[in-house]
Amino acid sequence: MGRSFYHFLMTYRDPKLTDQKTEFANNAYRDHSFPKQTRNYHILCDYLEFNAPYLPGMSIFDELWDAYLLDEEKNKH
């Protein structure tokens, strides 16, 4: 079993960059209620839609979710 989406997202953290993916990662890090252990797309979507005003649009999450799935598949073997 691989890592959670949160742990994947943390690879995008950087205090000096200001692109949307990095800002999402930095804000999720500061969000103490973020579902850190889940690998479930629907749980993450529901949480972000209702509890993450720092995410300007779900397309950022969707891009990172796709990258997460590719990374999980690559590291499966």
From Swiss-Prot:
It comes from Listeria monocytogenes serovar 1/2a (strain ATCC BAA-679 / EGD-e). Belongs to the UPF0346 family. SUPFAM superfamilies: YozE-like. NCBIfam families: PRK13672.1. Gene3D superfamilies: YozE SAM-like. This is UPF0346 protein lmo1857. It holds the Pfam family YozE_SAM_like. The lineage of its organism: Bacteria, Bacillati, Bacillota, Bacilli, Bacillales. Disulfide bonds: none annotated. HAMAP family: UPF0346 (MF_01538).
